[in-house]
Amino acid sequence: MTNPLKGQIEVTLGSETYKCRLTIDSLVKIEDELDTGILELAQNIAQAKVRIRTLLVVLRHALRGGGNDFDDKKVGQIISDIGIVVASTEVAKLLVATLNDNDSDEDDKKKALE
């Protein structure tokens, strides 16, 4: 079971469901590896301007953050098995879930009740 309060989410890749987590540290590593800001990366995926290497890097960091032991070869095989379109969709969902600021929504709800 995942813990959304810790930023964990489940991602279904083919017939398997994995725990994933992108921390600030992993987001910085992704930006460094791809030489692209995380928001620009998310926009590019939304506009179908995505490279397979981008999918591989984001998935590798997310899967490792969820406690899975994956290397580029294994992540590449998953992408090959499920297809680029499905992989792009799952990476987009993962980034949206990570970048979405749910805490501010909770603060707004608390203030409205006061």
Model-derived segments and spans:
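Charged interaction scaffolds used for protein-protein
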Residues: 1-17, 35-50, 67-114
